[in-house]
């Protein structure tokens, strides 16, 4: 019985370390994005829906930054409204990606916290199959939240390591 309880305690500690790593990675990515993405510019892009040279420079930096870690699946900047999320930047370059001004309806997890998303409140990560999405508010120069930086972190590598650990 003691061996089983030690294994369980070690496993719980291992899970906590992995969760802390994922949280830390997402926060580091978001903080770096805050250095690149100007909240006041986000408001301007949302209003006029026009891309300029500065827009593309930021977008390319976000794509480059996403590519620095295999665990960072996606970086987006999104403003939530009644109809869904209005995208400013999205680093998903597949057909599933969004462009400036695209509005995507709320998914099931987002719909459950729709009011918090519209208010740009701090929320817990949303869990999807194989990923955790972290929503970190982006503020204007007046310290008013204008959008979220959404960082999608892979949980597949952690799951593989867990299976190896348990195997």
What is the meaning of each model-derived region?
Residues 1-12:
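Extreme N-terminal signal-anchor transmembrane helix of membrane signaling/transducer proteins, especially
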Residues 23-57, 92:
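Extracellular/periplasmic ligand-binding regions of membrane signal-transduction receptors
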Residues 63-85:
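Short N-terminal helix-loop-first-beta-strand/juxtamembrane motif that initiates sensory/input modules
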Residues 90-126:
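Extracytoplasmic/periplasmic sensor domains and loops in membrane signaling proteins
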Residues 118-120, 128-139:
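A short beta-strand signature within small-molecule sensing/ligand-binding domains used
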Residues 128, 142, 150-167:
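Helix-start (N-cap) segments at beta->loop->alpha junctions
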Residues 137, 148-150:
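Short hydrophobic beta-strand segments that form the core of ligand-binding sensory/regulatory domains
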Residues 145:
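Glycine-rich acetyl-CoA-binding "A-motif" of GNAT/NAT acetyltransferases
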